[in-house]
């Protein structure tokens, strides 16, 4: 049974670092208290999601009267709350993803928040004191994040590549006529530097092509205001979270000439087929306290994932989507598209391996729970590969991975109707990059 907060109080080394939007409260901090948990790292995670998760988790444990106070820096907050008459605190610092690993290593944090995966160098530095942060017991994918690129409804443009986006927002392409549009200057609208939204765009688009945001871009502190500005200007283009598309047109995004442009929806972000999607993480050391481990487990639970949805991010709870035939796709693929539905998860693999990545291992458990509630339906697994190596070998590898997922399901009593391999066909990402190849190595899950 999970320990109570009172039991955790004995462990003074426990700490969590998170960043949040302060909730309304009149409570004042009158005493210096050692934080029960310290959560440090990503502003994208810390701004809204972390505070919501931590309050819900602590309330479940018996906490009440929550009050957030800003500390020395804007991104440093302290949560004060009461637990059975005792005053307790949680520390949340959101100075950026890299600080998650630095502060874990220097014992300034108990939990790290990150909007990117831990690097090999960070894993190596932390190995001796924190354990292997890349392993499933220490790495927790808590949400998915997607960015929509929006233009005015009257703009004829429908799709764009990430490279062209980088050239537009860096100012290299400055007129819509250069993209086959009207003879108008492109008006760039962007979120402010402190926003997780800009951080996402910067990492997935600008940095990818070694570009920087143009000085001519108008900056907004509010996604709502940015979206409204796009709707009022036929020459404008901007980027926002999925919840803020409003009256505008969202563009389909491709990663290159060989990939199909994909529109941003909660489904395409959930499957990670959409180019401007990314994973959000919590990291806990192997030696983390029971309370820290319980919090990470709560975040990835069905209840935690429902809270993810409420904050505007994309959860990993499974949803069903109707699929349509794709022009040029194999006939067998399109036959399934006519009669089946697709589930909002893809299983992905490390290069050259049949072993699921950490998200895949947890998604397997989610799929099993989903099928227990949909016991009359059957699954079809479709394997895909990157384009490195011979075509026949890639098709064989894609089949082997799909069969690896089948074995895991069948051994747990979940029936699989068919296993297919489409090899390197129908790529969702550019095979010229490591990240693109990783996204193409996937097993799609269909419901018949």
Regions found by a protein language model. Give the residues of each.
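Periplasmic OmpA-like peptidoglycan-binding domain that tethers envelope proteins to the cell wall
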Residues: 99, 384-448
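Ligand-binding "clamshell"
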Residues: 122-138, 246-270
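A bilobed periplasmic-binding-protein/Venus flytrap-type ligand-binding module shared by bacterial periplasmic
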Residues: 147-155, 271-273, 277-289
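Periplasmic peptidoglycan-binding/tethering modules of Gram-negative envelope proteins
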Residues: 305-310, 315-378
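N-terminal segment of the mature folded domain
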Residues: 19-169
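Ligand-binding pocket segment of bilobal, Venus flytrap-like solute-binding proteins
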Residues: 72-84, 101, 110, 194-261
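Periplasmic-binding protein-like
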Residues: 162-181, 298-319
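Extracytoplasmic ligand-binding site segments that recognize negatively charged/polar headgroups
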Residues: 48-50, 135-216, 221, 227-231
């Amino acid at each position: 049974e999970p320990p109570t907060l009172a039991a955790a109080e004995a462990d003074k080394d426990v700490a969590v670092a998170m960043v949040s939007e302060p909730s309304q409260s009149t409570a004042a901090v009158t005493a210096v208290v050692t934080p029960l948990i310290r959560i440090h790292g990503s502003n994208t995670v810390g701004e809204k999601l972390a505070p919501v998760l931590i309050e819900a988790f602590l309330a479940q444990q018996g906490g009440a009267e929550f009050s957030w106070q800003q500390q020395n820096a804007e991104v440093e907050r302290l949560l004060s709350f009461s637990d059975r008459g005792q005053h307790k605190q949680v520390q949340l610092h959101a100075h950026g993803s890299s600080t998650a690993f630095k502060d874990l290593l220097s014992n300034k944090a108990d939990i790290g928040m990150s909007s990117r995966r831990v690097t090999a160098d960070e894993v190596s530095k932390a190995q001796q004191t924190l354990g292997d942060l890349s392993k499933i017991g220490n790495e927790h994918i808590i949400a998915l994040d997607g960015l929509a690129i929006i233009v005015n409804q009257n703009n004829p443009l429908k799709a764009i590549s990430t490279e062209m986006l980088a050239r537009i927002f860096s100012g290299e392409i400055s007129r819509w006529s250069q993209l086959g549009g009207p003879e108008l200057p492109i008006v760039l609208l962007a979120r402010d530097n402190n926003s997780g939204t800009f951080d996402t765009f910067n990492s997935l688009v600008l940095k990818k092509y070694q570009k920087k945001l143009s000085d001519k871009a108008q900056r907004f502190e509010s996604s709502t205001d940015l979206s409204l500005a796009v709707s009022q200007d036929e020459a404008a283009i901007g980027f926002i979270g999925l919840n803020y598309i409003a009256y505008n047109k969202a563009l389909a995004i491709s990663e290159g000439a060989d990939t199909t442009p994909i529109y941003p929806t909660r489904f395409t972000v959930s499957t990670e087929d959409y180019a401007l999607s990314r994973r959000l993480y919590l990291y806990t050391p192997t030696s983390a306290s029971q309370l820290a481990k319980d919090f990470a487990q709560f975040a990835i639970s069905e209840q935690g994932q429902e809270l993810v949805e409420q904050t505007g991010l994309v959860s990993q709870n499974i949803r069903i989507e109707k699929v349509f035939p794709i022009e040029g796709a194999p006939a067998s693929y399109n036959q399934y598209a006519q009669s089946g539905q697709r589930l909002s998860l893809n299983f992905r693999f490390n290069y050259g391996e049949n072993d699921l990545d950490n998200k895949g291992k947890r998604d397997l458990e989610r799929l099993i729970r989903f099928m227990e509630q949909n016991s009359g339906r059957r699954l079809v697994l479709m394997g895909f590969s990157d384009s490195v190596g011979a075509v026949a070998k890639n098709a064989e590898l894609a089949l082997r991975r799909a069969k690896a997922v089948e074995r895991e399901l069948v051994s747990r009593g979940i029936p699989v109707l068919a296993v297919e391999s489409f090899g390197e066909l129908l790529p969702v990402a550019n095979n010229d990059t490591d990240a693109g190849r990783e996204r193409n190595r996937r097993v799609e899950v269909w419901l018949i």
